């Protein structure tokens, strides 16, 4: 039993005793002053008891309200924990990293803010969906580069995408021109090999021909000869070389660089052209487009 309850019981017992004494005085002749004193004492005791009971009730109400507030604060803390679980660490490679430092996750994002974070070396960037106003997509994300690993980004997603516009990474096609030796035709020919690989998106496909130290290697092509009738309807016919080489022309091993070298060759044939005319003819062939094939 609590101390407050014991005090209330004692007050009520004392009031009961005073009421009994007042009753006895009324049965017997007694002075009016003594009766008034007993009545005032009884009223005082009951007032004290009522005050104690009301105080305990207010105290219990206050205690319950504090318990409810504590539960609410715990629930808020749990909600924060749940929201923080929607976090993922994404490893970003150079090939997929965008110029603005964000990552390509298949959605269209627009950066709307950046903030310095206390205790962190890198700022935190804030992005919203590009279709926020056109399609009412409320998805947002926060991107921050890791302090320990520059290629690691911590991304926090808030909300889900409701838009229907999802981007997909584009691929570019590289064309490498190299000199190869083949036994199918009479001479050596230039083959174009196509390689597709995931790279940073570009607007158009490129034909890349890397020529290193061209001025120092003009002697490589001193026996090349061409005539106008050999190029017809976008087809490069087989006679690319006239005469036989002592050593075969080895193919280029690097992706798009021409590094082959001829060790020895016979005397130049009639109407042979220099390396400059060879490359001008090669440019004309490349201008035909990507659909030219060997006949």
UniProtKB/Swiss-Prot annotation:
Knockout consequences: Decreased tolerance to dehydration and salt stress. Increase in the number of necrotic leaves and in the intensity of necrosis in response to E.amylovora. Increased susceptibility to P.syringae associated with reduced PR1 induction in double mutants wrky46 wrky70 and wrky46 wrky53, and triple mutant wrky46 wrky70 wrky53. In these mutants, higher induction of PDF1.2 upon jasmonic acid (MeJA) treatment. The triple mutant wrky46 wrky54 wrky70 has defects in brassinosteroid (BR)-regulated growth and is more tolerant to drought stress.
Subcellular localization(s) per the UniProt record: Nucleus
Gene Ontology BP, a term: lateral root development
Post-translational modification: Phosphorylated and destabilized by ASK7/BIN2.
DNA-binding region of this protein: 98-166
One GO cellular component term noted in the UniProt record for this chain: nucleolus
Alphabetical UniProt keywords: Brassinosteroid signaling pathway, DNA-binding, Jasmonic acid signaling pathway, Nucleus, Plant defense, Transcription, Transcription regulation
Main location: nucleus
UniProt xrefs under SMART domains: WRKY (SM00774)
Entry-linked PROSITE patterns: WRKY (PS50811)
Keyword Transcription set for record: yes
SUPFAM superfamilies: WRKY DNA-binding domain
Tissue expr: Expressed in guard cells, hypocotyls, and in the vascular tissues of cotyledon and root. Mostly expressed in roots, at lower levels in leaves and petioles, and, to a lower extent, in stems, flowers and siliques.
GO molecular function: cis-regulatory region sequence-specific DNA binding; DNA-binding transcription factor activity; sequence-specific DNA binding; transcription cis-regulatory region binding
Inducing or repressing factors: Up-regulated by drought, salt and hydrogen peroxide treatments. Induced by salicylic acid (SA). Up-regulated by E.amylovora. Triggered by P.syringae.
Entries under InterPro entries matching the protein: WRKY_dom, WRKY_dom_sf, WRKY_plant
Keyword Cytoplasm: no
Functional summary from the UniProt entry: Transcription factor involved in the regulation of osmotic stress responses and stomatal movement. Interacts specifically with the W box (5'-(T)TGAC[CT]-3'), a frequently occurring elicitor-responsive cis-acting element. Positive regulator of EDS1-dependent defense against E.amylovora. Together with WRKY70 and WRKY53, promotes resistance to P.syringae, probably by enhancing salicylic acid (SA)- dependent genes. Contributes to the suppression of jasmonic acid (MeJA)-induced expression of PDF1.2.
Family as reported in the entry's similarity comment: Belongs to the WRKY group III family.
Subunit composition and interactions: Binds to BZR2/BES1 to cooperatively regulate the expression of target genes.
Protein name in the entry: Probable WRKY transcription factor 46
Organism encoding this protein: Arabidopsis thaliana
Lineage of producing organism: Eukaryota, Viridiplantae, Streptophyta, Embryophyta, Tracheophyta
